Design a protein with these regions (language model features):
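Short secondary-structure junctions
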Residues: 59-66
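Conserved Nudix-box catalytic region and its N-terminal flanking loop in Nudix hydrolases
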Residues: 18-58
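NUDIX/MutT-family hydrolases
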Residues: 88, 97-128
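Conserved N-terminal beta-strand and adjoining loop/helix that marks the start
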Residues: 1-21
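Active-site-adjacent beta-strand/loop module that shapes the phosphate/pyrophosphate-binding cleft
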Residues: 63, 72-95, 103-105
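Conserved hydrophobic "DFG−1" position in protein kinase catalytic cores
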Residues: 11-12, 23, 89-91, 106
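Hydrophobic packing within well-folded, soluble alpha/beta domains
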Residues: 48-57, 69, 87, 104
C-alpha cells in the first residue's frame, strides 16, 4: 500500500495559552466536507516545517510560525497509508483566507469533538485537548 507523507498545522490563537484551534472542512476529493487541520504533502527536499509553511500560504494565504511537533499520526485509509506530522502553529501574517477549504471554525477545547473530523485527525484530538489544559 502506498504511504503518503503529509504535515498538518494545529493553528492556535496563542501558542502559550492555546484557547482556540483553527479547523477547516475539506473542499475537494472523496473526503470533501470532513473537518481537518490544514496542511498537505511534503515535497522532495523540504523539511516538514518548510512544507507546512508553504502549504498554509497556498491554502490560507497566511504566514505561520511552526511550533513543537505534537505527534506523528499513522493511519490506514482503504486505498493508502497516511503518515502525518502534526505541529502547533500560530499566525504571524495574513488573515486565514479559505482558498481550498469549504468552511472553517475556531474551536475551543470543548468544541473540538463537535465537527465531523476525518479519521486521521480524530486520533489527534485527545492529545490536543490535553495540551490545551496547559
Amino acid at each position: 500500500m502506498k504511504t503518503i507523507k503529509v504535515v498538518a498545522a494545529v493553528i492556535c490563537d496563542n501558542m502559550k495559552e492555546k484557547n482556540k484551534i483553527f479547523a477547516t472542512a475539506r473542499g475537494y476529493g472523496e473526503l470533501k466536507g470532513g473537518w481537518e487541520f490544514p496542511g498537505g504533502k511534503i515535497e522532495a527536499g523540504e523539511t516538514p516545517q518548510e512544507a507546512l509553511k508553504r502549504e498554509i500560504m497556498e491554502e490560507l494565504d497566511t504566514e505561520i510560525k511552526v511550533g513543537d511537533l505534537i505527534d506523528t499520526i499513522e493511519y490506514g485509509y482503504p486505498t493508502f497509508h497516511l503518515s502525518m506530522d502534526c505541529f502547533w502553529a500560530e499566525v504571524t501574517a495574513g488573515h486565514l483566507e479559505l482558498k481550498e477549504a469549504e468552511a472553517a471554525k475556531w474551536l475551543t477545547k470543548d468544541q473540538l469533538n463537535s465537527v465531523a473530523g476525518l479519521p486521521a485527525d480524530i486520533t489527534l484530538i485527545e492529545k490536543i485537548r490535553r495540551n490545551m489544559d496547559n
